[in-house]
């Protein structure tokens, strides 16, 4: 095994850089992110608390708008509409998953595109496809690009197998990596791909985001690829519940050049890119394009 990625150390380095960036430009505590939480799942509460802590550490204002678990879709849309009109709100995210029966697209597209810092609205996904840099790229996809760049993992001309096709993660990653300047040859697979092992053996880089525990083992690999594991699932063991990625980590770790673990892997970098997008939103909405240029050079993807 060559490298097990340390996402916490990676992200912490950039958190300090963003903190200094905001301080130097007198922007600390002048940028506001609103987080809408409408479920009682422990995992969602944990993710929100992490985003809240990181934002405050670097100097962003965060307000968590907690709705009742009995909330209906119109309650969330009402909050979104209010924050769309709130001039002091720079970014809005809705913590997923939504409650059963809610229309994900209606809620995500309720957020005005200039404040959609998760980058999941139709407008921002369209801008991503067209290469419009004023749009917001989904944070996990952006995190993948950041890891590849900073770790010196070349994509141009390489074969990248992306396992997962969700519009939130897998599909944006496939589109971005096949576009300039990344120029990869992307093979898009999913949990129903019959010949997944055949495709994986062709891969220079594997990116998996399907949420199926231990889907990928060493029998499916060839030539020590780079692996970014985005999937996360709970599995039962004799010792109780544990987290698992899409890869069988212990099984493949000696058969790869690079791998991201489930804990402390892609997660901290995804939060980092949410902070980046939130600062970017403030700068664009206030026509601070010279400062935006410096930000993009600081956190280059």
UniProtKB/Swiss-Prot annotation:
Substrates-to-products reaction catalysed: (6R)-5,10-methylene-5,6,7,8-tetrahydrofolate + NADP(+) = (6R)-5,10-methenyltetrahydrofolate + NADPH; (6R)-5,10-methenyltetrahydrofolate + H2O = (6R)-10-formyltetrahydrofolate + H(+)
Entry coiled-coil feature ranges: none
A GO molecular function held by the record: methylenetetrahydrofolate dehydrogenase (NADP+) activity
GO BP: L-histidine biosynthetic process; methionine biosynthetic process; purine nucleotide biosynthetic process; tetrahydrofolate interconversion
Signal peptide from the UniProt entry: none
Top-level taxonomic group: Bacteria
InterPro entries reported in the protein's UniProt record: Aminoacid_DH-like_N_sf, NAD(P)-bd_dom_sf, THF_DH/CycHdrlase, THF_DH/CycHdrlase_cat_dom, THF_DH/CycHdrlase_NAD-bd_dom
Residues given in the record as NADP(+) binding sites: 164-166, 191, 232
Pfam family, one: THF_DHG_CYH
EC number(s) given by UniProt: 1.5.1.5, 3.5.4.9
Pathway: One-carbon metabolism; tetrahydrofolate interconversion
Gene Ontology annotations for the cellular component aspect, listed alphabetically: cytosol
Alphabetic keyword roster: Amino-acid biosynthesis, Histidine biosynthesis, Hydrolase, Methionine biosynthesis, Multifunctional enzyme, NADP, One-carbon metabolism, Oxidoreductase, Purine biosynthesis
HAMAP family cross-referenced by the UniProt entry: THF_DHG_CYH
Family: Belongs to the tetrahydrofolate dehydrogenase/cyclohydrolase family.
Self-association state and partner proteins as the record states: Homodimer.
Function: Catalyzes the oxidation of 5,10-methylenetetrahydrofolate to 5,10-methenyltetrahydrofolate and then the hydrolysis of 5,10-methenyltetrahydrofolate to 10-formyltetrahydrofolate.
Protein name (database record): Bifunctional protein FolD
Source species of the chain: Borreliella afzelii (strain PKo) (Borrelia afzelii)
Gene: folD
């Amino acid at each position: 095994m060559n490298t097990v990625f340390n996402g916490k150390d990676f992200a912490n380095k950039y958190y300090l850089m963003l903190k200094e960036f905001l301080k130097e430009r007198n922007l600390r505590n002048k940028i506001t992110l609103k987080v809408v939480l409408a479920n009682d799942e422990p995992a969602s509460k944990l993710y929100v608390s992490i985003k809240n802590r990181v934002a405050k550490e670097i100097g962003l204002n965060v307000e968590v708008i907690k709705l009742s678990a009995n909330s209906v879709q119109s309650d969330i849309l009402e909050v979104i509409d209010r924050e769309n009109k709130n001039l002091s709100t720079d970014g809005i995210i809705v913590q997923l998953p939504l409650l059963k029966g809610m229309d994900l697209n209606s809620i995500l597209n309720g957020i005005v595109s200039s404040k959609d810092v998760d980058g999941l609205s139709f407008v921002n996904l369209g801008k991503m496809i067209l290469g419009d840099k004023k749009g917001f790229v989904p944070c996990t996809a952006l995190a993948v690009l950041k890891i590849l760049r900073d770790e010196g993992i070349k994509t141009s001309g390489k074969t990248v197998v992306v396992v997962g096709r969700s519009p939130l993660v897998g599909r944006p990653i496939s589109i971005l990596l096949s576009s300039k300047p990344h120029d990869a040859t992307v093979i898009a697979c999913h949990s129903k791909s019959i010949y997944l092992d055949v495709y994986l053996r062709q891969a220079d880089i594997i990116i998996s985001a399907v949420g199926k525990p231990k889907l990928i083992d060493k029998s499916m690999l060839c030539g020590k690829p780079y692996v970014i594991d985005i999937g996360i699932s709970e599995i039962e063991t004799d010792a109780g519940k544990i987290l698992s990625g899409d890869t069988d980590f212990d099984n493949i770790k000696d058969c790869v050049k690079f791998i991201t673990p489930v804990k402390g892997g892609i997660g901290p970098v995804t939060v980092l890119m949410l902070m980046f997008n939130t600062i970017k939103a403030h700068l664009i909405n206030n026509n601070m394009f010279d400062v935006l240029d410096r930000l993009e050079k600081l956190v280059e993807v």
